[in-house]
């Protein structure tokens, strides 16, 4: 009888949060697995998971940087924080700079980076620096999460080096990150400090294993002069609560037209697709909302504001939460 009681108590301890009471990001997280599925971890289990992952910290966390310009638009030139490395590249201090940071399981050659690079170079002369952080390709999501602060610090150090030794302007600098890459961008901004990074764009900043109530450990509005978030899979792979000073909610921010309601990856990736289109076409009209709950509920009226999602002028005029109507296929923006 005692054995049965013990087994019942053990089972109760394991199922700490009943299924019907699980709130993603509040009392636990649905953490992505390598096969695309999600596994629930309550707060205790998540803490144990992170502790196990931290036991392997100290291993290599290589971060490399590849420069693309009008002179080399398709073949990135690796640059290091060394005088000759930068001088032997096509880096031009008179051109604005864009850092692009991939998320979990990504590489610098991924289509996300290719599309964002092409989008900016189609606009004119830019230094587009694509970041490759090797620990992102870990099979275990948690081990990549553990690498985020270190990767972000290295990106921040590179930004400082280019600013201090090669005249890169911080006033025209934008750092763009997707998913986990958004938080790498946040740590880069924290490393540079004092909101000296001009703009950070968080493309559906990852939520699993990040707490909204701990902005010092995620991308936050304090990491740059202006932080913009484009939130497309809120409450699942991305945050639902506003991350940026300007927080944009395409289709209400949870699921995207043309994506299955169960295909979180599709909605998560749409943030990249929308951003590329915003850079090249500036066609995402927005409706200002009283708060993010109204944006999620699509209860913001029908009057378009003067703000365009993803516009590079937003830093000087945008604050608040915006609902963004979108189409189910390209062009996704509804403003011509």
Name each model-derived stretch:
Residues 2-130, 137-147, 156-170, 193, ...:
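Flexible, membrane-associating and regulatory peripheral segments of lipid-active enzymes
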Residues 101-105, 178, 204:
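The conserved beta1-alpha1 loop
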Residues 190-197:
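Conserved hydrolase catalytic core segment
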Residues 225-230, 247-248:
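Catalytic His-Asp charge-relay segment
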